[in-house]
Amino acid sequence: MSLNIFWFLPTHGDGKYLGTSEGARAVDHGYLQQIAQAADRLGFGGVLIPTGRSCEDSWLVAASLIPVTQRLKFLVALRPGIISPTVAARQAATLDRLSNGRALFNLVTGGDPDELAGDGLHLNHQERYEASVEFTRIWRKVLEGENVDYDGKHIQVKGAKLLYPPIQQPRPPLYFGGSSEAAQDLAAEQVELYLTWGEPPAAVAEKIAQVREKAAAQGREVRFGIRLHVIVRETNEEAWAAAERLISHLDDDTISRAQASLARFDSVGQQRMAALHGGNRDNLEVSPNLWAGVGLVRGGAGTALVGDGPTVAARVKEYADLGIDTFIFSGYPHLEESYRVAELLFPHLDVQRPEQPKAGGYVSPFGEMVANDILPKSVSQS
């Protein structure tokens, strides 16, 4: 099976070490462009752009990098409760058109109640998933060209529609990750690709089986992806030494403060990440070549595959054997590590190389809208 391999744009910061300003790197547009262009040239299929108050806005970052890349796809965040589903559908169609079909969308419900409250969203975990289901139903239908009336518990729209369709038909794919039962129910009903963070294979297999069963009950099939860091070197010894260097500046106080901050999250996935290491820097290899050191101070994806190229490839194939076809990787610093992954890992995998998009992105093939709502009459050519 050919694998889709994505990279990551570190809009929340980058550097050689975790938890310290030593070796930190300024993340400006020029640096993000370097990473995006490297990923484009090296054969990564796309890049995940993170979201949240610690990050630059994912939509603006993607829009700024479209003109300087050729094949790379951009996986940007949809935020139910933060934006209207109808407006989000228009934005999605525009990004897809301007990128010539290189837009992908990642549904993010949020897991930090404090940050969500700051953004004006005051729903609990269950209510957020209820609202996300309503959001996604509307978003999908509008993008697929339907006129939508919807009267939900959290969202109501009347006469929602899209005048300019996306390039990808019937619409761009929707990605989503979540570990709670409510999240799995949403994935089974609404998304094309279900993402998990890098838990040990047995735990990932259990989640995949649960989502598959739920999707089958609705007559659907769902693809699967995984989000992992990678520390790959020419030898296993070098890789493990690099892993230790990455956290060499962490002290107990920094780890304790980070874990206390992450503990307020109501995200089940974040709780599962934290349980892998328990805030303890001892015994961080939680499964063969799966290292939980990143999660000591980083929220979200907290595990890395560590080893030489053949070893990491073997672990990737273990996940692929579970049904995973998409791998979203990252590494510190992200520019250099994109080359290491491409040079040391890609030769040992069947990597699906992205194709050059066909030309044809345009805004209006028919002239200006009449009264902002009506297509102009077409004129036959004789």
UniProtKB/Swiss-Prot annotation:
SUPFAM superfamilies, A to Z: Bacterial luciferase-like
Major enzyme class: oxidoreductase
Keywords tagged on the record: Flavoprotein, FMN, Monooxygenase, Oxidoreductase
GO terms classed as biological process: alkanesulfonate catabolic process
Keyword Oxidoreductase in annotation: yes
GO terms for MF: alkanesulfonate monooxygenase activity
Record Pfam families: Bac_luciferase
InterPro entries xrefs: Alkanesulphonate_mOase_FMN-dep (IPR019911), Luciferase-like_dom (IPR011251), Luciferase-like_sf (IPR036661), SsuD_RutA_monooxygenase (IPR050172)
EC number per UniProt: 1.14.14.5
Reaction catalysis annotation: an alkanesulfonate + FMNH2 + O2 = an aldehyde + FMN + sulfite + H2O + 2 H(+)
Function: Catalyzes the desulfonation of aliphatic sulfonates.
HAMAP family given in the database record: Alkanesulf_monooxygen
NCBIfam families registered for this protein in UniProt: alk_sulf_monoox (TIGR03565), PRK00719.1 (NF001939)
Family: Belongs to the SsuD family.
Stated name of the protein: Alkanesulfonate monooxygenase
Gene: ssuD
